[in-house]
A protein has these predicted regions:
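A short helix-loop-beta-strand connector motif used in the catalytic cores of GNAT acetyltransferases and
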Residues: 43-53, 64
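An amphipathic alpha-helix signature
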Residues: 9-16, 36, 40, 44
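Residue-level detector of secondary-structure transition/capping positions
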Residues: 23, 32, 47-48, 133, ...
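Juxtamembrane/interface motifs at transmembrane-helix termini
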Residues: 34-38, 46-47, 84-85
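A generic membrane alpha-helix/interface feature
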Residues: 38-41, 47, 128, 151
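Conserved GNAT-fold acetyl-CoA-binding loop/helix
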Residues: 23-42
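Acyl-donor (CoA/ACP) binding surface of acyl/acetyltransferases
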Residues: 1-21, 55-160
Length: 160
């Protein structure tokens, strides 16, 4: 089982370690190279609407992050993202965390739906978001990155 909690400064070390992973660097927009200072800045400034640490509920071991990036005031769509550290993969932590995050933000009259743009080639993340109840709504070029290069993205939506 999994739980979510707010970021704490003590998370800086494991976030730094996790973000050295090639898979995280491949599919996210983190700086490259990723420094300890980058991790500290992210925690201190928390640039997202909400960011939560995904933890194993028995051991409290941090496994990854899940976040709502912002809220579009016109469409009331809330783009989200997530990543799982190498030591947390294969446990379905991300799909559980997506469901937990949606339960945490609901009800919020400012959010009509949560969306995720996932690179077409990122099959693991596509399975994750589908397990969390999202449905494919369209495909757009350039809304996702692979090693910072624009690629075809699939837009997924879950209406609240």
């Amino acid at each position: 089982m999994f739980q979510l909690r707010r970021l704490q400064y003590e998370d800086v070390e494991w976030i730094f370690d996790a973000c050295q992973d090639e898979t995280i660097q491949r599919w996210t927009l983190i700086p490259r190279p990723y420094s300890f200072e980058d991790a500290a800045w992210f925690i201190e400034n928390e640039p997202e609407y909400v960011t939560m640490v995904i933890e194993d509920s028995e051991s409290s071991m941090p496994l990854g992050l899940v976040s709502i990036h912002d809220i579009d005031e016109i469409t009331r769509e809330a783009p989200m993202g997530y990543w799982i550290a190498p030591w947390g993969r294969g446990m379905k932590a991300a799909s559980a965390a997506v469901k937990l995050l949606i339960a945490t933000i609901t009800p919020d009259e400012n959010i009509h739906s949560v969306i995720a743009y996932i690179a077409e080639e990122n099959t693991a993340s596509r399975r994750t978001i589908e397990r969390a109840g999202f449905v494919e709504v369209e495909r757009e070029w350039g809304m996702a990155r692979e090693f910072l290069n624009e690629v075809m993205a699939i837009k997924y939506r879950k209406t609240l």
